[in-house]
């Protein structure tokens, strides 16, 4: 009986290892490839979580940077190198030794929050969800994404798809009172100076046909002046000398604050976009 219990314990312990993230990808060269335990191969991308059994191939001259979640250390590998993820770290099979750096506690906390916020459903493959709805006739909003935090007092809307004939964009304040109505004449909608937006305001919005039928709806918040200033002043310049890890952490900070427009600019500078559930895909 004790032998049977030991086998059961070993089985469930192995399952736990197989489902628990071991490393968090911070940066990867364009040609770095991950192979999962099922033999599926895909590009290594920032924000991916790698589990026990993943293999990584780093070609010559390519760079691969990860956070080892158990130790809190950043490890940077330079190709040619072959790596494997074991129970609690990433192991170098062959290639130059990794360079090891500590990470600031605020960055570790942010990664922990990110993993909890964007936990990938079991069984889904990276990049399997769509970053944005496919092109088609149905009306959709590109900006502001529902729930966005705006870092400006001059909101602008960008739509895609079939615009309603003689449609209106209607804004409502936090009490549900109508704030502004703007005709939709193109995919780009801005507001005149008479629409006085203030820091810290919350809005819901609707696109309505002239006949009154609602086509689309959403919400956005304008940041407080202090929050907007803090996020904008923390901006990391996209220079050749800038570490991609620094851009990543700034993008994560913006994303978790809800400043999706600014975060998208950072993701683009890293050559990626995020799916609706926070998974990375490479920009083509």
Language-model segments: which ranges?
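Compositionally biased low-complexity segments at domain edges in trafficked proteins
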Residues: 94-113, 231-268
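N-terminal signal peptide c-region/cleavage motif recognized by signal peptidases
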Residues: 13-15
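Long, contiguous interaction/recruitment modules in multidomain scaffold/adaptor proteins
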Residues: 127-238
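Short, charge-rich amphipathic alpha-helical segments embedded
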Residues: 260-284
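Flexible, surface-exposed loop/linker segments and immediately adjacent secondary-structure boundaries
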Residues: 19-155, 247
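Positively charged n-region of N-terminal signal peptides that target proteins for export
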Residues: 1-4
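Hydrophobic helical h-region of N-terminal Sec-dependent signal peptides
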Residues: 6-10
């Amino acid at each position: 009986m004790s032998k049977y219990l030991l086998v059961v314990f070993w089985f469930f312990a192995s399952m736990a290892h197989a489902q628990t993230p071991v490393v968090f990808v911070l940066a990867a060269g364009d040609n770095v490839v991950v192979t999962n335990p099922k033999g599926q191969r895909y590009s290594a991308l920032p924000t991916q979580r790698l589990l026990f059994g993943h293999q990584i191939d780093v070609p010559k001259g390519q760079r691969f940077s990860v956070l080892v979640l158990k130790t809190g250390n950043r490890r940077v590998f330079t190709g040619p190198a072959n790596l494997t993820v074991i129970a609690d770290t990433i192991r170098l099979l062959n290639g130059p030794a990794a360079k090891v750096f500590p990470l600031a506690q605020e960055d570790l906390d942010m990664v922990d929050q990110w993993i909890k916020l964007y936990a990938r459903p079991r069984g889904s493959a990276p990049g399997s969800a769509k970053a944005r709805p496919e092109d088609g006739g149905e009306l959709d909003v590109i900006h502001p994404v529902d729930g966005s935090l705006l870092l400006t007092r001059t909101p602008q809307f960008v739509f895609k798809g079939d615009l309603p004939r003689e449609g209106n964009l209607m804004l409502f304040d936090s009490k549900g009172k109508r704030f502004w109505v703007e005709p939709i004449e193109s995919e780009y909608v801005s507001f005149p100076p008479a629409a006085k937006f203030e820091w810290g305001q919350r809005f819901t919005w609707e696109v309505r046909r002239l006949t009154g039928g609602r086509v689309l709806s959403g919400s956005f918040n304008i940041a407080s002046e202090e929050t907007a200033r803090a996020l904008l002043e923390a901006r990391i310049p996209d220079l050749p000398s800038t570490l991609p890890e620094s851009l990543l952490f700034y993008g994560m900070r913006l994303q978790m604050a809800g400043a999706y427009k600014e975060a998208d600019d950072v993701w683009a500078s890293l050559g990626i976009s995020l799916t609706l559930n926070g998974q990375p895909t490479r920009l083509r």
